[in-house]
């Protein structure tokens, strides 16, 4: 588990993607994966400090959790990179989820006031 965001971590992702791929092949079902990278994240860290960056990461993780289904598998892969495995999801539906994620993150107002801003 990623200590900062509460999402699965990279190691768990690597285990789960193997499991989900095997299950998808075995059951002949769709499996999609979304890779999400936060634009300009380095600028946030450089301008406001790492505590503010942590607030952004937690905020994005919360948006991901609220946007995807309960059985989808959200992971913080490292830094500002996230992966979401979407079992039993075709490409069109995965695209719709990715667009909802992008829109929800783009429209979010993530509060960094709890961080001691530089």
Describe each model-derived feature in a short phrase.
Residues 32-37, 74:
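Active-site-flanking beta-strand signature of metal-NTP-handling nucleotidyl enzymes
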Residues 10-30, 61-69, 87:
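Short regulatory alpha-helical coupling segments
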Residues 15, 22, 43-46, 66, ...:
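Regular, well-ordered alpha-helical segments
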Residues 52-73, 81, 100, 105:
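Active-site-proximal alpha-helical element of nucleotidyl cyclase-like catalytic domains
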Residues 85-94, 113-117:
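Catalytic strand-loop-helix junctions within cyclic-nucleotide turnover domains
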Residues 73-76, 117:
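A short pre-motif secondary-structure segment
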Residues 1-15, 36-49, 58:
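Conserved nucleotide-binding and Mg2+-coordinating catalytic segments in signaling enzymes
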Residues 46, 86-89, 106:
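Residue-level recognition of strand-loop junctions within catalytic nucleotide-signaling folds
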